[in-house]
Amino acid sequence: MGLQACLLGLFALILSGKCSYSPEPDQRRTLPPGWVSLGRADPEEELSLTFALRQQNVERLSELVQAVSDPSSPQYGKYLTLENVADLVRPSPLTLHTVQKWLLAAGAQKCHSVITQDFLTCWLSIRQAELLLPGAEFHHYVGGPTETHVVRSPHPYQLPQALAPHVDFVGGLHRFPPTSSLRQHPEPQVTGTVGLHLGVTPSVIRKRYNLTSQDVGSGTSNNSQACAQFLEQYFHDSDLAQFMRLFGGNFAHQASVARVVGQQGRGRAGIEASLDVQYLMSAGANISTWVYSSPGRHEGQEPFLQWLMLLSNESALPHVHTVSYGDEEDSLSSAYIQRVNTELMKAAARGLTLLFASGDSGAGCWSVSGRHQFRPTFPASSPYVTTVGGTSFLEPFLTTNEIVDYISGGGFSNVFPRPSYQEEAVTKFLSSSPHLPPSSYFNASGRAYPDVAALSDGYWVVSNRVPIPWVSGTSASTPVFGGGILSLINEHRILSGRPPLGFLNPRLYQQHGAGLFDVTHGCHESCLDEEVEGQGFCSGPGWDPVTGWGTPNFPALPKTLLNP
């Protein structure tokens, strides 16, 4: 049956399911560890579904990102506005008309869009949703560190074939809330000795990365930073105030968040959320800070999508955003990954610096046809974000040089090819590293990550008014490098009349690690088998897929990144 016949029968197909296709045939639908099913959802219960509408001019958007992010380009720093981006990628009138008419015919009347018009979120009853999406069958699930409740379908859904040119995927059916990169160790026992520290605090970070008490925001510039929180994780103002009383006495700082975008819950504070806010605001001290709160319960079925839509609905945004969450690439559909990557590209075109944690599973490991392979994570593997790995002190209780934190995520994407900006650095690593794993374990031609690193081991956090030691993970290193260090550099750039850093990677790789401490010792974990025996990639001189170009050396890094 041809496309015209499918179009003529579009609304009858809502019920019949003929001329249908699966937008996400490769989406993994197995239940993640720690989640349990509570049974079928009530047919009259309401849920929200997010329809990702097909965008236009994505290739042109990619060209513009390259132009505004490359210091050698005459367009460098001339970022697009949200309205510019909307004009470029807005779905065609045919797409908007076709999808809206289809939804109205199905009874979906409570829908709202975003400024770019490429997402449409609708509230429907379970009964309506299952008729609209043949094959879907919604169940209640509970799980995750905060016992989050979600509604998902364990079965694949179909769309009318006539919608294939118009809809990338439907969010809110399969993907569970993303995982966090965070772990907590028992507190080590050590006898008190002069010069020792008993965990990473703002003063330890400032000492290691050469930040002085004067390296803080001016409080007068139009500078801001943000972190995103999911999984019903919330911070408490009282925890932030106590953290600053305990650890912020030797530098100027702000003791409250400037703005919360989304829904800030009233429940117990989460360690993840507390960590993000406290170290973002102590490394990037005295800089206006926003928190994006996307719990993924009532506001939207998929919290990460909810955050992306918030970015597409605000004209004036913080310059730097840090995110400490991710999923394995192989757990996500190609349609979802490619569309999210385009959303990250949109942010880069607008001059936003997005930093993602590289994860806490080293190179990762999974079995394909009985053979082990490394397991990259996304969005850490996106070519349009700056990914942050993790390090530890060489001597755990002294402020020394850094080595690899063995859990630091890193590797090579199985989805995205290697971007041109890192061609030289990655080629050099692959040709010179004496400790490469067998080639069958990784895709040597893929986007390689992380790009940079920072301390990720042994942090102090205040949560629910209790100081908690030895919290670790790239969830810790990301706000330190991203919001903190880069926001301070943006402060200097803005005060001198320059644009903010924007998408950092093209410039970062052109500088060949200038302004960073090179981390050259240590390897991260991987598959426990006879071939690699638990060892993934190892660090070495220059860029490597464990710590990237290294960790920040503040006096040198601003000099590198201030001009042009």
Curated annotation (Swiss-Prot):
Propeptide at: 20-195
The record's annotation in Pfam families points to: Peptidase_S8, Pro-kuma_activ
A biological process (GO) of this protein is: proteolysis
Q: Which Gene3D superfamilies match?
A: Peptidase S8/S53 domain
So what does this thing catalyse? Release of an N-terminal tripeptide from a polypeptide, but also has endopeptidase activity
Q: Name one GO molecular function term.
A: serine-type peptidase activity
Gene Ontology terms: cellular component = Golgi apparatus; lysosome; melanosome; membrane raft; recycling endosome
Q: PANTHER family given for it?
A: PROTEASE S8 TRIPEPTIDYL PEPTIDASE I CLN2, TRIPEPTIDYL-PEPTIDASE 1
Assembly, per entry? Monomer. Interacts with CLN5. Interacts with CLN3.
Protein name, UniProt field: Tripeptidyl-peptidase 1
Tell me the gene name.
TPP1
